[in-house]
Design a protein with these regions (language model features):
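Bacterial Sec-dependent N-terminal signal peptides
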Residues: 1-26
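Extended soluble regions of mature proteins
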Residues: 21-219
Length: 219
């Protein structure tokens, strides 16, 4: 159960959507960096990361997007899981491989308010794609998102009710999926970077939820 909740919480940093424009998949590499190097010896931090994710020390998330829907295959090294957004009820469903128990979060609500979104001068190049960035500030921390409006465009109207993770406001601001995200909160420093992508037709069946024996609302 702890693993399920962990995967769902990681969705805050990696949460992505799609649009009528982009249909396909993006694979992200997610790293948990030392949030307090002056307080936590890096050797101890890396040991904890290896215990969580194995020798690879990072998580892979392959996300499929189509017409306002998204679903992800999550490889956390020692654990594998799934994350699916259901636009019909507005919930995110997270579950482990071979499990019939899901943990959900209501994306129509967001307790992390207020926020401020502003343009940033930070630039980066991800997989040969030049990116500019925005900064999202909230009560609990700060997030930087790198993007290029020529790639992975979305229709913000599809996410106007998707308040969780401030996704509705982020999509309204940039109108596309981010290629890189860095989020810093109390004792947390997560970096997620695109390492692969492909525009392709996605079968609707991939977004279908399995039958669960138990559904736990995390909020």
């Amino acid at each position: 159960m702890t693993k399920q909740i962990l995967i769902l919480l990681w969705a805050v940093y990696s949460i992505t959507a799609n649009s009528q424009t982009f249909e396909g998949f993006i694979t992200y590499k997610t790293e948990a960096l030392n949030p307090e190097p002056t307080m936590i010896p890096d050797s101890i931090w890396q040991q904890g990361v290896k215990e969580q994710f194995g020798d690879r020390t990072y998580m892979l998330q392959k996300s499929y997007y189509k017409e306002g829907r998204y679903t992800s295959e999550i490889d956390a090294g020692k654990e594998k899981g799934f994350l699916t957004y259901n636009p019909e009820d507005g919930f995110l469903y997270s579950w482990q491989e071979n499990s019939d128990v899901a943990v959900t979060i209501n994306t129509k609500t967001n307790t992390d308010e207020p926020i401020k979104i502003m343009d940033s001068k930070q630039l980066d190049t991800i997989m040969g794609i030049p990116c500019k960035s925005i900064i999202v500030k909230s009560d609990t921390g700060e997030m930087v998102l790198w993007y290029n409006t020529d790639y992975f465009r979305v229709n913000p109207k599809l996410y106007k009710k998707h308040k969780y993770g401030h996704w509705n406001r982020i999509m309204e601001k940039i109108g596309c999926l981010p290629l890189k995200t860095e989020q810093k909160k109390f004792m947390s420093h997560i970096v997620q970077t695109m390492i692969d992508y492909k525009e392709m037709e996605i079968n609707d069946k991939i977004f279908q939820l399995p039958e669960f024996k138990e559904i736990i609302n995390a909020k």
